[in-house]
C-alpha cells in the first residue's frame, strides 16, 4: 500500500517527503487556507493521519498485507500558525512498539499510539498529534 495513492490523500496532494528527515509533505496552496490566511487545521490533521499510517506501514513493510489498521483516535495540539509547505514525521516509543507487537502476536489485535510532528519549511513545530491505531490480523478464510 502507498498512503500517497489513497484517493483522499492524492486529492489533497500529500506526497512522500523529498528529505529523509520527514515521511510526508504537503505543498503550499491557496486551497488549504483558513479564514486567517494560514494553512487550515484540516489540512494539517490530514497530513498527520497520513504520516502515522506511513509510519505503521514502514513498521510492517513485509507483512502489511496481513494487517487491517484503522484510526481509532486522533488528538492534536496546534502550536503556531502554519504557512507554506508543511512536513510530517512520526515515532513511537520502543516500549510501546514491543507491547504492541507482542499483543498483536498473542491476541491477533492491538492498539498503538503514534506521535506525529508537523513542521513548516523553517523547521518550526506547528502541530503535534497522537494517532491511535487499532490493528488486527487478517482472518484467512481458507483456514476456517
Residue ranges, per PLM feature:
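Short structured motifs
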Residues: 10-14, 72-78, 99-101
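Catalytic strand-loop segment that frames the active site of acyl-thioester-processing enzymes
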Residues: 7-39
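Hydrophobic residues on conserved beta-strands that form the core of alpha/beta folds
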Residues: 13-16, 71-73, 113, 128
Amino acid at each position: 500500500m502507498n498512503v500517497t495513492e489513497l484517493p483522499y490523500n492524492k486529492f489533497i496532494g500529500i506526497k512522500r517527503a523529498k528529505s529523509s528527515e520527514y515521511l510526508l509533505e504537503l505543498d503550499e496552496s491557496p486551497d488549504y487556507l483558513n479564514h486567517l490566511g494560514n494553512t487550515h487545521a484540516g489540512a494539517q490533521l490530514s497530513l498527520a493521519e497520513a504520516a502515522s499510517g506511513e509510519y505503521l506501514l514502514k513498521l510492517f513493510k513485509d507483512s502489511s498485507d496481513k494487517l487491517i489498521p484503522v484510526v481509532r483516535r486522533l488528538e492534536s495540539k496546534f502550536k503556531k500558525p502554519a504557512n507554506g509547505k508543511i512536513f510530517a514525521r512520526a515515532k513511537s516509543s520502543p516500549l510501546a512498539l514491543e507491547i504492541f507487537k507482542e499483543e498483536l502476536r498473542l491476541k491477533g489485535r492491538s492498539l498503538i499510539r503514534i506521535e506525529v510532528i508537523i513542521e513548516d519549511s523553517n523547521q518550526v513545530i506547528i502541530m503535534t498529534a497522537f494517532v491511535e491505531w487499532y490493528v488486527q490480523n487478517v482472518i484467512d478464510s481458507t483456514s476456517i
